[in-house]
């Protein structure tokens, strides 16, 4: 591992990386930039926070991801739908949304009611699993979880996840109707995102305290739906011999248990290049291409 060379690459190329951390065998061994002082947009890495909250909530409410998502969504909104829409969404389990395997959903909800927008999308073949990455799926899971809990999901996350992890610098977004927006909009420090990664690396424990069930972590980090990138779990991505938390513009937390590594960085690089990833793999993972 040559972390200094990775940092030199970042600086020399002018990559807008806010900060980076590397953990080996649960210990912070390298850091660069702003890792603890300021929060930064993590975009779709927000979905990973929602994913772990799904399991945490099982301590307080029976939340069965194999039930139709309509079982948990507001009944008045479901009853107001045309019969065909009710039948269609009634065939879609929470698990299908967790694994991004519902076709036809556009990328993001729009309008004054994200919920009505989402529930009125025409799903042509609800029984066919197809990878369709979008924000609506995560939004609906968040609404379903909030309704099942009967409480504000953002506040619940603060109490049940962030407090045990020692996360106290954060921001998150809401939809126009006030529901926690589980798809994007969260801000964390680099170190705070690493803590979420460490929770998953430890198969659900943090500093000796069990927060998630080991079974859920195994399911969430395993391939549940195949895609071009190698597979998708419960709002988590397969990455080499491990998995990753991803957000646009290169927000990353790579969790590699077999290598005993966690690599986290937050940045703002608005392009589709793999230069930063290639540099990380070369100097941190020792992968030559």
Task: Indicate where each model-derived feature is located.
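Active-site helix/loop module of the DD-peptidase/beta-lactamase fold
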Residues: 60-100, 148-188
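Active-site Gly/Thr loop motif
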Residues: 215-266, 270
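Catalytic-site signature segments of enzymes, centered on catalytic residues
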Residues: 29-36, 104-186
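Short, gly/Ser/Thr-rich active-site loops of penicillin-recognizing serine hydrolases
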Residues: 275-289
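A short, well-structured edge-of-sheet supersecondary motif
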Residues: 3-36, 65, 253-256, 260-264
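Non-transmembrane alpha-helical segments in soluble domains
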Residues: 55, 70, 95-99, 142-146, ...
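Active-site SXXK
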Residues: 26, 41-66, 141-145, 196
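Active-site-proximal alpha-helical segments within enzyme catalytic domains
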Residues: 140-144, 184-205, 251-267
């Amino acid at each position: 591992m040559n972390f200094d060379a990775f940092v030199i690459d970042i600086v020399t190329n002018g990559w807008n990386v806010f900060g980076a951390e590397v953990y080996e065998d649960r210990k912070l061994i390298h850091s660069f930039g702003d890792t603890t002082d300021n929060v930064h947009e993590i975009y779709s890495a927000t979905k990973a926070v929602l994913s772990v909250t799904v399991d945490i909530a099982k301590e307080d409410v029976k939340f069965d991801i194999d039930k139709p998502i309509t079982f948990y969504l507001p009944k008045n909104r479901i009853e107001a739908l045309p019969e065909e829409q009710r039948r269609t969404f009634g065939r879609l389990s929470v698990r299908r949304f967790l694994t991004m395997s519902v076709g036809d959903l556009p990328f993001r909800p729009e309008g004054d009611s994200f919920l009505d927008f989402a529930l009125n999308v025409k799903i042509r073949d609800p029984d066919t699993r197809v990878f369709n990455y979008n924000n609506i799926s995560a939004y609906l899971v968040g609404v379903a979880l909030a309704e099942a809990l009967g409480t504000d999901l953002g506040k619940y996350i603060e109490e049940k996840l962030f407090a045990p992890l020692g996360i106290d610098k954060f921001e998150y977004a809401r939809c126009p109707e006030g529901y926690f927006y589980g798809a994007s909009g969260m801000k964390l420090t680099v170190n705070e995102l690493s803590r979420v990664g460490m929770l998953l690396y430890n198969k659900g424990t943090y500093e000796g305290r069990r927060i998630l069930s080991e079974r859920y972590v195994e399911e969430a980090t395993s391939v549940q739906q195949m895609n071009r990138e190698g597979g998708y779990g419960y709002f988590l991505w397969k990455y080499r011999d491990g998995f990753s938390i991803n957000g646009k513009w290169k927000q990353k937390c790579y969790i590699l248990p077999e290598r005993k590594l966690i690599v986290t960085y937050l940045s703002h690089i608005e392009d589709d290049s793999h230069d930063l990833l290639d540099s990380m793999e070369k100097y941190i993972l020792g992968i030559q291409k």
